[in-house]
Amino acid sequence: MKTPITESIASADSQGRFLTTTELQSVNGRYQRAAASLAAARALTNNAQSLITSAAQAVYSKFPYTTQMPGPAYASSAVGKAKCARDIGYYLRMVTYCLVVGGTGPMDEYLVAGLEEINRSFDLSPSWYVEALSYIKGNHGLKGQSATEANSYLDYAINVLS
């Protein structure tokens, strides 16, 4: 899994050299942000159910047809609503994984690779998840560096979906 630290090491190793001052500064920067990232991951995990439920409501409010259209891709039934919440939870979980490792590797490897195919196969609209993640970003309650760290991965996911 790629992280800023593993990328620096892989680059230096492939060239048979020690880490440069710039690479060491990059690694040090990651360690300085690690506490804030872990605090953000912990807070998002602890508040996950509430954030997911509220984010799903934000999707239903912005896209009311999602609760009116019959079919497996929509939230017109309890099963459909549960699937929507499950999918939002998956995105949020990926954000917490990225916070823990300090890079987009988990999202790139477990989510981005097959995202377009999954959405097309199941007739899912990326705009639903953009709305859900935007809601989470605006309502996670994090402050300072923890918010900055979480928002960077939420933004990454939003951009991938856009």
UniProtKB/Swiss-Prot annotation:
Keyword Transport part of the UniProt annotation: yes
Protein's membrane topology: Peripheral membrane protein
Subcellular location: Plastid, Chloroplast thylakoid membrane
Transmembrane segments: none
One of the GO biological process terms: photosynthesis
GO cellular component: chloroplast thylakoid membrane; phycobilisome
Description of post-translational modifications: Contains one covalently linked phycocyanobilin chromophore.
Matches recorded under InterPro entries: Globin-like_sf, Phycobilisome_asu/bsu, Phycobilisome_asu/bsu_sf, Phycocyanin_a
Keywords carried by this UniProt record: Antenna complex, Bile pigment, Chloroplast, Chromophore, Electron transport, Membrane, Photosynthesis, Phycobilisome, Plastid, Thylakoid, Transport
Sequence positions that bind (2R,3E)-phycocyanobilin: 84
Function per UniProt: Light-harvesting photosynthetic bile pigment-protein from the phycobiliprotein complex (phycobilisome, PBS). Phycocyanin is the major phycobiliprotein in the PBS rod.
Description of how the protein assembles with itself and partners: Heterodimer of an alpha and a beta subunit, which further assembles into trimers and the trimers into hexamers. The basic functional unit of phycobiliproteins is a ring-shaped hexamer formed from two back-to-back trimers contacting via the alpha chain subunits. The trimers are composed of alpha/beta subunit heterodimers arranged around a three-fold axis of symmetry. The phycoerythrins also contain a gamma subunit which is located in the center of the hexamer.
Family: Belongs to the phycobiliprotein family.
PANTHER family given in the database record: C-PHYCOCYANIN ALPHA SUBUNIT, PHYCOBILISOME 32.1 KDA LINKER POLYPEPTIDE, PHYCOCYANIN-ASSOCIATED, ROD 2-RELATED
Protein name: C-phycocyanin alpha chain
The organism of origin for this protein: Rhodella violacea (Red alga)
Phylogenetic placement of the source organism: Eukaryota, Rhodophyta, Rhodellophyceae, Rhodellales, Rhodellaceae
Gene that specifies this protein: cpcA
